């Protein structure tokens, strides 16, 4: 019995020694920092996944330039604001509410001459007499009238049906 008591007494002492060693290992500053880093990495990965769900990079690159620039990327993927604007395709159409006719300057004949280059050679490229100038202007006006008539006929044909096409 004395042997069993001594064995029992030795066991608690050995467990106390093990317990004392474990807290010493847990309290080392290196381990504490690594645990905090791991927990912060877990949180940051969760935040990144939630941001990716709500703000996918493919859909909103122009709305989030600061986020795109601040992320850690290889140098070829990281775009500065200058490069973002240079890489964009220029707008082919004017912004909403602004028609092309408001953007263009000049008289009707000048615009027509710009649109259809064959008129430039007919009217502006030659020295015309007054009669020839009048005749060329009459031809242009006749073309304009025919165009308007065709537009009106098309408009009436579209609206003369009981149901839309």
Curated annotation (Swiss-Prot):
Its main location: nucleus. Residues 1-101 are annotated as: Disordered. This is Transcription elongation factor A protein-like 1. May be involved in transcriptional regulation. Modulates various viral and cellular promoters in a promoter context-dependent manner. Does not bind DNA directly. GO terms for cellular component: nucleoplasm. Residues 33-60 have a biased composition (Acidic residues). It holds the Pfam family BEX. Belongs to the TFS-II family. TFA subfamily. The keyword Metal-binding does not apply. InterPro entries: TF_A-like/BEX. Keywords: Nucleus, Transcription, Transcription regulation. It is found in: Nucleus.
